[in-house]
Regions:
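Ligand-binding clefts of soluble mixed alpha/beta catalytic domains
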Residues: 1-256
């Protein structure tokens, strides 16, 4: 696995290398990445923009998706990388480490029934369900601020690392769009490369409609999610929590 820590300015050709690594951690107000700087943007387009607005940590963490993690300082950056390394193997030929804990794998969470609303139209927080089914309620989320209508991240079950992909009804009702399709597809392909099983929790009304999505290539980007699931040879377990309609049902790790 390759991990980038962005703790300073990076511009031009130097920004392509971080984008090709598996995970990018950016320090807020310090790390910046852009192909062309604010001066060039002003000269060519007449657009006034600051370093942070153009390529700061929050920009890449919430809009472009280049940053998988946005942290406050360098210490938090190193801690986040250490935690990430605890979930993944050293290379694609190894298995992930087993971390023993006192959480009974046969534990039943009777409160889970209270998380789901009786009215299927009402939103709920899918993360509450995730916390209830994993070891010690510890979930290491990836791309937390980007494409929040889908959740991806690492957790453990009975001490073994798993990847979790889940629709988030709190955002866009859990519908799939361009960004969420790319986010989930990339995560699935990483898990497939490094022998990490995937558990998928589904509650989605479909793909996001509209001219904006169609014109920007929802067909092309949406198909990446189907391809990632189809290509993956790791164990895949899918649980339909709520809605699963249309093409989004097929895309979210369905038996089809």
């Amino acid at each position: 696995p390759q991990i980038t820590a962005s703790i300073g300015p990076s511009a031009g050709g130097a920004v392509y290398s971080p984008a090709m690594t598996d995970f990018v951690v950016m320090v807020d107000k310090i790390g910046t990445m852009f192909v062309t700087g604010p001066d060039v943007v002003k000269t060519v387009l007449g657009e006034e923009v600051s370093f942070d607005e153009l390529g700061g940590a929050m920009t890449h963490g919430t809009k472009s998706g280049v940053a998988h993690f946005v942290v406050k300082n360098e210490y938090e950056c190193m801690d986040r990388i250490k935690t990430l390394l605890s979930y993944i193997p050293q290379n694609n030929t190894e298995e992930t480490s087993i971390v023993l804990n006192d959480d009974d794998p046969n534990r039943l969470d009777h409160n889970i029934i209270n998380i789901l609303p009786e009215d299927s139209i009402k939103p709920y927080d899918m993360k509450e369900i995730i916390y209830s089914i994993i070891d010690n309620h510890n979930f290491f989320e990836i791309h937390e601020l980007f494409a929040q209508n889908i959740i991806v991240g690492f957790a453990r079950m009975h001490g073994r690392t798993i990847g979790i992909v889940a629709n988030q009804p709190l955002f866009l009702a859990g519908a799939l769009d361009i960004d969420s399709s790319n986010k989930a597809a990339r995560f699935i392909r990483f898990c497939d490369c490094y022998n990490i099983p995937i558990v998928t929790l589904v509650d989605t009304p479909g793909y996001m409609p509209g001219t904006n999505q169609e014109h920007n290539g929802i067909i092309r980007h949406g198909s990446k999610l189907l391809y990632a699931y189809s290509e993956a040879t790791i164990p895949k377990i899918t649980i339909v929590i709520g809605k699963a309609y249309g093409g989004a049902y097929i895309a979210m790790g369905s038996k089809n």
